[in-house]
Structures are given as structure tokens and as C-alpha cells.
Curated annotation (Swiss-Prot):
Organism domain of life: Bacteria
A Pfam family recorded for this sequence: SlyX
NCBIfam families: PRK00295.1
Protein name stated in the entry: Protein SlyX homolog
S-S bonds: none
InterPro entries attached to this UniProt entry: SlyX
Family from the record: Belongs to the SlyX family.
Signal sequence range: none
PANTHER family xrefs: PROTEIN SLYX (PTHR36508:SF1)
Amino acid sequence: MSLEERVMELESRMAFQDDTIQALNDVLVKQRREFDHLQQQMAAMIKRQEEMGSQFDTFEEEAPPPHY
């Protein structure tokens, strides 16, 4: 294999690697957005659960009805 062929082969590999790196970066960016969205949803669910839990806590603290 001549030097020119080796250089062409390396340039070709480098071009494919650049494409692969860009594709991987695109996937990573998409996953990061999805992760951030899921974190926001999780925080909202935790807040809602805490609010619901505090509602149930108030029921337990109330005195029983007079017929008990």
C-alpha cells in the first residue's frame, strides 16, 4: 500500500468517525433533553405526592366522630 493510499484510507476513516461522533452527539443531546424532562415530571409527581400525603395526615389528626 502506497503512502497516498494510506493517507486516503486514513482520511476516509476520519470522515466516517466524524459522522459517527456527530450522530452520537445528537443522540446524547436528545437523551439529555428527555432526562431533563423526566426529572421535571418526577419533581412534579413528588410534590403532588407530598401534597396528597399532607391531606391524609390531616384526616388522621382529626378527632373521631361523636358516635364512637
